[in-house]
Amino acid sequence: TVLSCSYTPVDGVVRVYDLDRLLSPLITGVMADFTFTVGGSSQTLHLIQSRTRVSMPAADFLDSHFLSSVTSERDTTMDRKEMVTLLSPTEAVNITATCVYANGETCVPQSVQLASALAAGQVHEVDCSPSLLVNDALGELVQYTINAGERLMTFRVSPTQTHRLALLMRNNFGAWEPCYFQGMNEHDPKITRELALVAGSVRPLKIDEEDTCKSYTGPLRPGAVQLFRDLARAYEVKLLDGGVATDPLVISDAEVKHTDDDGSLPAFTFSWRRAARTSAMFDVPVIPRIFDDTFDETFN
């Protein structure tokens, strides 16, 4: 219960201001239902989260867009996890990927169905990673467009791009969305010590380490600017390791300044740490195996 009290009307009207600030912390994902009861009469509202103002009515946006701030072509690679999230208010939708394969000097189009008859009024998260669309018989996947009714999202598959950090965040609309950093990571562990004089000697009583990392996006295409601005305001962020969400983390600072100069490429920086009290992590190297357990260990 958020508002449970008596109100005194002014000129016969009761106004509750900043209702969005009261309800926003209660919406953990994309959508939440709230029931308002006044004088025994109730009305239920279905609220869709958006942390920024959108330049079109909610119904029009939901019918024509995925729940993402990215509206132009995106870059991806074969080892990346990609996903789209949608909410169709009134009708069931099918999701297809229109792929383009390069085979020598020929481009071969091919349509692949990813999901069918997704129910209306529900939030649907669909995996559209490029690894799911590989077709060696047709050639090398170079581009694909995700289609869901009027909604479109185009990915350009790069054979050369790499990333040094992958994060999964709840974006502007509360939907999970991955983002990839191509720049370097700058580690800046901060160690604090509490010392005391014990039996004539100075001894450390407590040593704490806060493992902070500063990550650089590298040059961004214009369409990625809004994605990383979403990351700067995100409340929930996780590390993405091999396409799997792992440790929660906290963004402590973000530099997202950019211009509209056609000759400039924006590049942002983010400072972050793991959310756990012990933020330092020791990654144990694993020796790769050549053969599985059916072979003699001598060969490994």
Regions found by a protein language model. Give the residues of each.
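Extracellular/virion structural assembly segments
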Residues: 81-90, 98-101, 118, 128-139, ...
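Preference for solvent-exposed, low-hydrophobicity sequence contexts
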Residues: 1-160
